[in-house]
Curated annotation (Swiss-Prot):
Protein's recorded name: Pyridoxal 5'-phosphate synthase subunit PdxS
NCBIfam families the record matches: PRK04180.1, pyridoxal 5'-phosphate synthase lyase subunit PdxS
Catalytic activity annotation: aldehydo-D-ribose 5-phosphate + D-glyceraldehyde 3-phosphate + L-glutamine = pyridoxal 5'-phosphate + L-glutamate + phosphate + 3 H2O + H(+)
Annotated positions binding D-glyceraldehyde 3-phosphate: R162
Residues annotated as catalytic: K78
GO molecular function: pyridoxal 5'-phosphate synthase (glutamine hydrolysing) activity
Amino acid sequence: MGLDNLKVGLAQMLKGGVIMDVVTPDQAKIAEDAGAVAVMALEKIPSDIRASGGVSRMSDPGLIERVMDSVSIPVMAKVRIGHFAEAQILQSLKVDYIDESEVLSVADSSYHIDKRKFTVPFVCGATNLGEALRRISEGASMIRSKGEAGTGDIAQATKHIRAILSEISALTQAREDELPARARELGAPIDLVRETARLGRLPVVLFTAGGIATPADSSLVMQLGSDGVFVGSGIFKSEDPKAYAAAIVQATAQYDDADLLARVSRNLGQAMPGVSNLDVRFSSRGV
């Protein structure tokens, strides 16, 4: 239990911040200089994964190590859902966090990784409270609402964060004798359901991901109740990555200051091109 608390505590340290996808050490330095609390090292950002199709896997360990060597902030890396061997490799590299990610191809359609067997904290995606609690029961130390990565479209991100938070709100209104039935409906352990009802929030940090492309997008999900944001394609597919990175960090930290939001949103150049008609929905993977 001590290790679990330590891992959850490490994830709590990222609260209120921005985690940025990077594919080179230079991009990692841009993210760090802009004030990112962590970077996600991968070979392709989600929009390129979406465009190229095929099977997407864990990134080359050499790339991950080069990113780790280039920055002082925490480094995350992605593994396929259920691929515990990829996770073992990342743990051996001493990455700071592992993301069991629906953005990559699914390795096991029946089981997620048993994250309790690892010393590294895990991040997992969810579209609703049941998914979130199941991932936490497997050992996830952070949940991110999935959204639709690589689209630049915030619609699914807002849908998923609203779904999770509204289901938590409903739990807090339930009587104690109703919670076992709620647990069955959610497909989640009763102890986690009770803890969530008592806390009025998840027992781990809840970030938002998928489609965040502007400072206003970040402000929106923070005002809805997110603890922080992941930004993938939105930074390095924009016209001015340095400016967008800095602006989104400021917007996340001071999300309720409309004057600041207006100021940091000025003269940023073109945001990433958006994709709204999806042939592949990453968010449907790994429920």
